[in-house]
């Protein structure tokens, strides 16, 4: 057991336009080198593009995309004897959200569109519909956990 004090979680202020803490957290994931204004411009631009392309509310589509991407189970390596097993474990809610945001940003960065605004908007729309690279990543993680179900008795 560590002897240090438990560090208090920092409070994340909601974003100025929509008042959503989840969106503010996503901006922090997207931000590079502390450039928050650039991250805000990209996210708000992407949400505007989503609003143009879809009849639904852009924040609803963002939330739906994150819900679709969130993994329920993942695999963790556990060493037993001389062998390393990939043990499926349930993902706690805070990590679920963090992974979904990370995967959405990574998938958007790897897309082929010209600007990051277009890439992010496209990936959000795809994820909300249940397709795209971020959803594929989730399916791969779930498939890996399913394949290693036999080792689930090696709990953490």
UniProtKB/Swiss-Prot annotation:
Gene3D superfamilies documented for this protein: Ribosomal protein S7 domain
Keywords annotated in UniProt: Ribonucleoprotein, Ribosomal protein, RNA-binding, rRNA-binding, tRNA-binding
MF terms (GO), sorted A to Z: rRNA binding; structural constituent of ribosome; tRNA binding
InterPro entries to which the protein is assigned, alphabetical: Ribosomal_uS7 (IPR000235), Ribosomal_uS7_bac/org-type (IPR005717), Ribosomal_uS7_dom (IPR023798), Ribosomal_uS7_dom_sf (IPR036823)
Pfam family of the protein (one): Ribosomal_S7
CDD domains: uS7_Bacteria
GO BP, sorted A to Z: translation
CC per GO annotation: small ribosomal subunit
Source organism superkingdom: Bacteria
Disulfide bonds: none
Family: Belongs to the universal ribosomal protein uS7 family.
NCBIfam families xref list: rpsG_bact (TIGR01029)
Subunit relationships: Part of the 30S ribosomal subunit. Contacts proteins S9 and S11.
Reported function: One of the primary rRNA binding proteins, it binds directly to 16S rRNA where it nucleates assembly of the head domain of the 30S subunit. Is located at the subunit interface close to the decoding center, probably blocks exit of the E-site tRNA.
Record protein name field: Small ribosomal subunit protein uS7
Originating gene: rpsG
